[in-house]
Amino acid sequence: VPATGSPRRPDGLSETTAAALLRVSTATISSQLRKAGLNETFIAGVRPGDPSRRLLGRARTLRYLPLREDVFARIGNGMNAQKRAVESLSPGDVLVIDCRGELGAGTIGDILALRAQLRGAAGIVTDGGLRDTEAVRELDIPIFYGGSHASVLGRRHVPMDIDLPVSCGGTLVNPGDVLVGDGDGVIVIPPDLVDEIARLSLEQERQEAFILSKIRAGASVDGWYPMDAAARAQYREATDTDIEKASTP
C-alpha cells in the first residue's frame, strides 16, 4: 500500500475486486492466471521505484520504435506521442511504455512523470530506462522501470503509437488490461478474468496463511504444502471454506 494515500479504484473494477487486488501478491495472481491457462502475464525485468507502493490500474499504452533520425525529425519533437499519451491519462490509468527492453536511453523523466501524477494516473511501467530517477522516485506515483539512464529518449527511440497492443518486458499488454504491481514486479490480468482471479487469489492467500501458521507451529511441509486431504479437512473445519478450486498448486 502506498506510503501516502490509497490508489484510486480504476473505473469498471468493483470495490471488492479492487480491495482484493491491492491485498494479494503478484506471485499469487500469477499462480491463479497459470491455472486459468495464462503463463505469459508477468512483465519481466522491471523494478519498483519504491517496493512498498502497490500499483493497480488499467493499461494505457505507448510504443517506442528504434531510432531513425529522419523519422524522429518528422514526428519526435513537440507534442509527440509520448507527450500526447501523458496528456491523455485519466484517473486509474497506468502508462505502459514499450521500449523493446532497450536500456540505452531514458524513456520518461520527472516532468512528464509529475504531469502523469497530477492527471491522476495510477502508475507508470516502462521496460526501458528512467531519467531523473531519484526525483521520479520521490513523486506520489508508482513507477516500475528497467534501469536508469540519463540520456533523452531520442538517443535510441522514436515515440510512435498510443493505445495499441504492445510488448512490455516481453509480455503482451492490451489497452484496458488490469495491471497489479508490488515488490516482485508487474502482472497483467485480462479484464474478463479479473473478478474471478481476484477472488481466487484472495482465497489462495487465506489458505497459505493457514499453512504458514502450521509450519510456524512445527509442522512439516509434507501434507501441508500442498495440502493433502487431511490438511484440507482441517482448513475447512477452521474456516468453513471450500478450497478445492483456489488451492495452492
Residue positions per predicted region:
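C-terminal binding/interaction regions
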Residues: 179
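Beta-strand-loop-alpha-helix segment that lines the small-molecule cofactor/substrate pocket
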Residues: 182
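Feature captures the catalytic cores and cofactor-binding loops of soluble hydro-lyases/lyases
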Residues: 2-175, 189-249
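Channel- or pocket-lining gating/hinge segments that regulate access to a cavity or pore
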Residues: 185-187
